[in-house]
């Protein structure tokens, strides 16, 4: 080893000339043994005010400022080991030991700021020399390298980011949207075709899909497993972008996030800003997928078994995971991912442990998210590089109450037959959602690898046969559903999943498996569904009507045999926008009305960028009879009160005429009738009218009930709402 020597004269050594006793420091803030807390938040004092709502939201939560930690546990030095000493003190001395610790601040590898570029808020611990990685586990590993507290981090850089995240988290936990999305796990697998090139590397490409299938085996029947495997999607080569992309896979991912999913798990290649070489998700100068992720506050927990996607300790670059968790009121509730590279085997082993810990046989864990992750950490480096971005005290979105005594009658169903789900409820009364799903089928996909065709086989989820809602009382429920003519005749049985809630806080979920389907008698029905269009306010719409862009269009589809939702080729539920050329399959958006097996709706989001809307809807009933309907609407962008298409009909009239008009918003309407000379002869009493088309009748009589003489008259219609007023003057004629 090389050695370094220093030489100096003894006279160069300085000696203190005076020592003055200043007294002893009383450590009374954090070294108070009477402290009690379940949850600790660690961050700078500047973040304290922003953290107060979370402190109040959580039970027994203490905010420990970094300044106090450094002062009491590392002699004032900004040393991450001071954080560990503090946390160890809480475990050994506090009256109540905290279980979780939330690190409120970003970090990088340079806590001593040797580079001069460090912007650390709350430091992490860097492990290793040649191969290094960041881990927060070591901050709570007091007797070795296994963490003894559940740890999570929000990589905040500013007080505003803290406020935004805490607002999102509290809103999510206190106003979590109900629905079947809480029973959904979305498994995403990278394409097996690239970037591996050598024949011996083929197993790596295959492993993404194979290990996702392995993970699916850890997930119970009462959960809905959506599979988004990139091998299913077509390749696109565009000269404007380098390499092969799969834009349909990206759009399918966005659609799934919009519909809602409790967990989204990715297995495949990645880097700090990208999933898959085909750019399934990416942040770059040319493309920012983060801005396209819309969850409608059905915030998923993201689990990414890939390389470096959560590399938060890089001084020069922010990772996708950091930006995603910071997204205000959208994006993610929490993220579990790696900050360095990981092997195929270590990856699937850790992911399996996560799901095995959440789903324990016939029960769902009651642990918070941080404790779930802590409980599967063993001190190995593969586990240490998996980080939790988010509050470790956050509860899982899956309802904890399971209903296991449900049954379907009859247990073998024929096509076009009606089945009934019968179950007892832990909730006295409320509403629920039922989904009837065909059995999965084995499929084989081909892909090109090293100029050779390869194949991969997996189980494809069965199509949805029914998706409806119901209400119940007296702690029992018995919703019905119909079997369509289109079934896959899979060798695997069908299943029913359901969720119920009381409209407040109580929820329960369950499923019934082993439902067998067979071919039934043919139907005499030859009529297709009836398709109508409505505004959100319930107004029936027809061609040429007005719809404000701040309202959704309701598409109602009805048929005595029910609506075909299987998605079988040629029998899809399509919405075609003839102005944009876009066609979407609306099967996932269709939901039956409460307690109905005949009628349901699709909520169509209207773009505020368009002036007109032209849609063609095609639908099939369960007996495979088709219908097509078309509508053209004028889209109103302004929120200003206006009256359009005002006329009276018939005109001239003898006994009665109708004043018709369209309103751009609800308003109070009055109509006055005048002679040509301006004398008022009739006032029609003010009445409230709804947005859209309206009509008011008049019998041609004056205020005293007398018939008015033949001739020309003027009418004045006034619309008023709040401080907005509008008038219209027109002519009418009476002729008898």
Regions found by a protein language model. Give the residues of each.
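Short edge beta-strand/loop segments characteristic of extracellular beta-sandwich folds
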Residues: 420-426, 552-560, 658-664
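Short, compositionally biased P/S/T/A/G/V-rich stretches that sit at domain boundaries
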Residues: 388-422, 518-551, 558, 636-652
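Long, low-complexity serine/threonine/glycine- and acidic-rich segments characteristic of extracellular
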Residues: 435-517, 535-539, 544, 548, ...
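Short, conserved beta-strand segments of beta-strand-rich sandwich/propeller modules, principally
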Residues: 493-497, 612-616, 658, 695, ...
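Cysteine-dependent hydrolase recognition
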Residues: 1-469, 473-482, 487-492, 497-519, ...
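A structural signal for beta-strand boundary/capping segments at domain termini and interdomain linkers
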Residues: 564, 624-628, 680, 705-707, ...
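Glycine-centered coil/turn sites that cap beta-strands in beta-rich domains
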Residues: 632-649, 653-675, 683-687, 695-698, ...
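C-terminal tail/sorting-segment detector
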Residues: 632, 706-736
């Amino acid at each position: 080893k090389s050695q370094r020597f220093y030489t100096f004269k003894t006279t160069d050594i300085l000696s203190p000339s005076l020592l003055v006793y200043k007294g002893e420091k009383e450590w009374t803030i954090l070294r108070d043994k009477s402290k009690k807390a379940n949850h600790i938040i660690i961050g700078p004092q500047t973040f304290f005010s922003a953290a107060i709502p979370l402190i109040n939201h959580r039970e027994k939560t203490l905010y420990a400022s970094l300044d106090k930690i450094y002062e009491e546990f590392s002699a004032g030095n900004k040393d991450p080991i001071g954080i560990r000493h503090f946390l160890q003190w809480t475990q050994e001395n506090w009256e109540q030991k905290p279980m979780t610790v939330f690190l409120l601040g970003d970090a990088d590898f340079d806590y001593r700021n040797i580079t001069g570029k460090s912007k650390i808020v709350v430091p992490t611990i860097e492990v290793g020399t040649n191969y290094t990685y960041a881990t927060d586990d070591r901050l709570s590993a007091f007797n070795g390298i296994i963490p003894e507290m559940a740890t999570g981090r929000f990589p905040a850089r500013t007080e505003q980011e803290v406020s935004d995240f805490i607002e999102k988290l509290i809103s999510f936990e206190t106003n979590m949207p109900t629905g079947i999305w809480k029973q959904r796990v979305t498994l995403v697998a990278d394409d097996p075709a690239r970037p591996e090139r050598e024949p011996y590397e083929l197993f790596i490409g295959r492993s993404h899909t194979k290990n996702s299938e392995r993970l699916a085996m850890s997930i119970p029947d009462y959960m809905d497993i959506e599979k988004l495997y990139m091998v299913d999607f077509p390749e696109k080569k565009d000269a404007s972008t380098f390499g092969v992309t799969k834009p349909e896979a990206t759009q399918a991912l966005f659609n799934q996030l919009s519909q809602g999913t409790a967990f989204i798990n990715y297995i495949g290649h990645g880097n700090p800003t990208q999933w898959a070489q085909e750019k399934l998700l990416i942040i770059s100068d040319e493309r920012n997928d983060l801005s396209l992720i819309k969850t409608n506050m059905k915030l998923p927990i993201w689990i990414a078994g890939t390389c470096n996607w959560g590399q938060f300790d890089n001084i020069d670059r922010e990772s996708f995971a950091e930006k995603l968790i910071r997204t205000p009121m959208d994006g993610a509730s929490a993220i579990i991912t790696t900050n360095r590279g990981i092997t195929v085997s270590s990856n699937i082993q850790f992911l399996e442990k996560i799901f095995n810990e959440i789903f324990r046989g016939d029960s769902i864990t009651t642990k918070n998210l941080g404790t779930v992750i802590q409980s599967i950490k063993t001190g190995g480096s593969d586990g240490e590089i998996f980080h939790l971005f988010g509050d470790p005290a956050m509860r899982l979105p899956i309802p904890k109450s399971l209903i296991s005594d449900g049954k379907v009658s009859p247990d073998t169903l024929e096509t076009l037959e009606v089945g009934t789900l019968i179950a007892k409820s832990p909730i006295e009364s409320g509403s629920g959602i039922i989904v009837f799903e065909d059995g999965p089928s084995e499929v084989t996909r081909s892909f090109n690898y090293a100029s050779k065709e390869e194949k991969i086989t997996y189980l494809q989820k069965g199509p949805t046969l029914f998706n409806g809602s119901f209400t119940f009382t007296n702690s029992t429920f018995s919703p019905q559903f119909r079997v369509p003519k289109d079934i896959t005749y899979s060798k695997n049985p069908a299943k029913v999943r359901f969720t119920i809630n009381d409209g407040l806080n109580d929820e329960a979920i369950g499923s019934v498996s082993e439902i067998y389907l067979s071919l039934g008698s043919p139907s005499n029905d030859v009529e297709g569904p009836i398709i109508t269009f409505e505004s959100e306010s319930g107004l029936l719409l027809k061609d040429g009507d007005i719809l404000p862009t701040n309202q959704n269009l309701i598409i109602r589809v009805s048929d005595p045999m029910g609506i075909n939702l299987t998605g079988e080729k040629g029998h899809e539920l399509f919405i075609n926008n003839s102005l944009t050329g876009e066609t979407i399959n609306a099967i996932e958006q269709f939901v039956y009305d409460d307690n109905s097996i005949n009628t349901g709706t699709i909520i169509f989001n209207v773009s505020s960028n368009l002036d007109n809307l032209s849609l063609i809807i095609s639908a099939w009933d369960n007996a495979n009879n088709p219908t097509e309907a078309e509508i053209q609407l004028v889209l109103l962008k302004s929120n200003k009160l206006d009256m359009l298409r005002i006329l009276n009909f018939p005109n001239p009239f003898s006994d009665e005429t109708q004043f018709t008009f369209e309103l751009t918003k609800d308003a109070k309407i009055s109509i006055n009738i005048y002679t040509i000379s301006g004398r008022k002869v009739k006032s029609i009493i003010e009445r409230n009218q709804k947005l859209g088309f309206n009509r008011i009748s008049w019998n041609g009589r004056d205020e005293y009930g007398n018939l008015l003489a033949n001739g020309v008259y003027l009418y004045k219609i006034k619309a008023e709402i709040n401080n907005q007023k509008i008038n219209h003057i027109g002519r009418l004629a009476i002729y008898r």
